[in-house]
Amino acid sequence: MSQDTLFDKVWDLHKVSSLPGGSDQIFIGLHLIHEVTSPQAFGALKDKNLKVKFPERTVATVDHIVPTDNQSRPFKDNLAEQMIETLEKNCLDHNIRFFNIGSGNQGIVHVVAPELGLTQPGMTIACGDSHTSTHGAFGSIAFGIGTSQVRDVLASQTIAMNKLKVRQIWCDNKLSKGVYAKDLVLHIINELGVKAGVGFAYEFAGPAIDDLSMEERMTICNMSIEGGARCGYINPDEKTFSYIKNKLCAPKNEHWDKALKWWKSLKSDENSIYDDVVKLNASEVEPTVTWGITPGQSISINQQIPLLDDLSPNDKLVAKEAYEYMSFKPGQLIKDTPVDVCFIGSCTNGRISDLRVAAQVLKDKKVSKNVKAFVVPGSEKVATEAKQEGIDQIFKDSGFQWREPGCSMCLAMNSDKLIGNQVSASSSNRNFKGRQGSPSGRTLLMSPAMVAAAAINGKVSDVREFIN
């Protein structure tokens, strides 16, 4: 009787050969590219007079460096314009599908691929971006890769990798009202640590995971990398299949029937052997906020920032650095911390369901006069849906700026940046020093609903106080 995990099954199906040194050559079913990590890779192909091996398995969009305030071409930022022109040319030269600005399908690569039905169970997916793990929400095995591996996939459709161990993270019960997938994944990272996943793939399972929507599952898998894991995934189910059905690039007619039959066979065996199993009680998770300079430094909304004596020797060093950088004191409550900027967006929380939840909090309320708040839809499709539902108007009426799709302030590789020592309440995925554009800017990670609550009060707040 088979005892394989989904990871084992997908890995074995895509294994081309075993390589000297213990790594495997893995075929990549879908390669996603964008404007930042692809130019050098295409340049390397040109130097060797090579063409893209499987252009039909390669899909491009622009997201990282595009401005969100004004997307009229040419961009004011000459570098941004140059990078997008380069991607346009490379896609044209190699016959690669390119979802450009104005296509109706441009956006953050990890938002666009699922909403188009490109992301499917049983796939291997690679992209020159660490948050490629997002796609594991569909039962695919998805890896972020560096530019040299982007080159390899373009040239051969394969990468060399060591097979990962698999840790199952079992989440019992269900999340309480006012607690979201973002809170759960921040809680998981805090419990296990930011390095616990090194060498692992994370399988998220249990009643709490089953209860999540597909977009919430994407949030969970998106931040696997923040826990040190190379990828994260969830076994596909009826929610997965329903989400994909009738999407632009999903299989149709008899191809759908054939795909569905195969997808339903793709799940970890009941008696799968895992390298490690961790069990958590999701009903105990509360709205969660980061206080430090790693995503693992988080606490519940009513908790105090940890005392040094309560931390392990390794955690103490990072905590001291975080106290100083964030201007927090041990024992201080995170609640009521003043914020200057509120950002809703990113590949973690820039989908339509994220905007809906935040809009419910903001409806008939106003952003604090001391706060600059802006929302960046994850894609043109998300923006269109939001406008059709009147969500954009709720944001505008509250005082949020409504922006165009892009990565925006998640990584500030564009014009959206913190200034000086500003404190940001952000729905993104990383709170490293300088992550949001200012060398001294400070980031507090939280759910979109919590960002909305912070925007209204001008300080870190418990969103449950806004929910009837």
Curated annotation (Swiss-Prot):
The keyword Metal-binding applies. Pathway: Amino-acid biosynthesis; L-leucine biosynthesis; L-leucine from 3-methyl-2-oxobutanoate: step 2/4. Residues 424-443 are annotated as: Disordered. GO terms for molecular function: 3-isopropylmalate dehydratase activity; 4 iron, 4 sulfur cluster binding; metal ion binding. [4Fe-4S] cluster binds at residues 347, 407, 410. It catalyses: (2R,3S)-3-isopropylmalate = (2S)-2-isopropylmalate. Keywords: 4Fe-4S, Amino-acid biosynthesis, Branched-chain amino acid biosynthesis, Iron, Iron-sulfur, Leucine biosynthesis, Lyase, Metal-binding. The keyword Transport does not apply. Residues 424-441 have a biased composition (Polar residues). Binds 1 [4Fe-4S] cluster per subunit. Its cofactor is [4Fe-4S] cluster. It comes from the Bacteria. Its EC number is 4.2.1.33. CDD domains: IPMI. Pfam families: Aconitase. Belongs to the aconitase/IPM isomerase family. LeuC type 1 subfamily. Heterodimer of LeuC and LeuD. HAMAP family: LeuC_type1 (MF_01026). Catalyzes the isomerization between 2-isopropylmalate and 3-isopropylmalate, via the formation of 2-isopropylmaleate. This is 3-isopropylmalate dehydratase large subunit. It comes from Prochlorococcus marinus (strain MIT 9215). The lineage of its organism: Bacteria, Bacillati, Cyanobacteriota, Cyanophyceae, Synechococcales. The gene is leuC.
